[in-house]
Amino acid sequence: MEIRHSFDVKKCILCAYFVTFFAYLIIGFVPAGATDYIVSARISIPAINLLSDVTTLEKDGRTLHTPDTIVGSYSESENKTLLIGHSSTVFKNLDEAEVGDAIWYNGHGYQIVETDTLLKSEINMDKLLKPEETDTLVIMTCAGEELDNYDATHRLILTAKAV
């Protein structure tokens, strides 16, 4: 008895398309290039297995709108950058980062020198964005108890200095 197998390239490509599409619908998988963000940099924190694209943000009055699935960057000076992202997506493991962990951002090395968790009402954005003498990253995400509209009671803030 002979068994014949046929291979149809068109069916295979169509199948791969549908698998990707349904993965996107079911688990939120987004194929590369499927967002409206312009990638301006990349960030890596190896200790927590973080690797993400970064897009530059513009202020809307006094508000920064956090991207859904990647990191957003904002800077008012050459040597201090604020990076923000959602704790439910890109920064889901950020609370596991520790003082001393390495960060690679835009081709430069940094080391975490401070971690802090503050009430949302205690955040002073002017202080967070104030220029410093050395290159500094400030990374912020939601923490604490979840509130409505994808918000939370606290903010986890990591400060990293260039090495």
Task: Please name every model-derived segment.
Residues M1-V19:
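N-terminal Sec-pathway targeting helices
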Residues L14-V163:
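Solvent-exposed, non-transmembrane regions of membrane-associated and secreted proteins
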